[in-house]
């Protein structure tokens, strides 16, 4: 187990549907700590860089267009194994394959409107955080609930 950070984004459909609060609650209730958050309308170039690994896919242009369609709630969460556990909280990329109780299992139907993005590895989390946030935007703080969430520091 390691203490790490992950990048989580609530996509335009999630923002438009008023899901920012419920999604934040899922991460807070699990015991993770929010260290950065902003509502942004990123430029196309930033989205193309974020999804560069998908640039050869037929759905790439549609994905970028969809991500440009409204504001995105960009966040950085911190905690033990937050990358892997965060992906579990989000559910499978295809909402129809997501278990009930996951964000996508509860709030999404179509893969093209799957509400949120989460880093898939610690390495990618670092890249995504650097793409979306300046270092000074990440706030270092100790949650009052830390000792109630973690047995050992």
Curated annotation (Swiss-Prot):
Pfam families in the cross-refs: NDK
Record's protein name: Nucleoside diphosphate kinase
Record-listed ATP binding positions: 11, 59, 87, 93, 104, 114
Gene: ndk1
Organism of origin: Aspergillus fumigatus (strain ATCC MYA-4609 / CBS 101355 / FGSC A1100 / Af293) (Neosartorya fumigata)
Function recorded in the entry: Major role in the synthesis of nucleoside triphosphates other than ATP. The ATP gamma phosphate is transferred to the NDP beta phosphate via a ping-pong mechanism, using a phosphorylated active-site intermediate.
Keyword Cytoplasm on entry: no
Recorded superkingdom: Eukaryota
Broad EC category: transferase
Active-site positions on this chain: 117
Catalytic reactions on record: a 2'-deoxyribonucleoside 5'-diphosphate + ATP = a 2'-deoxyribonucleoside 5'-triphosphate + ADP; a ribonucleoside 5'-diphosphate + ATP = a ribonucleoside 5'-triphosphate + ADP
Family assignment from sequence similarity: Belongs to the NDK family.
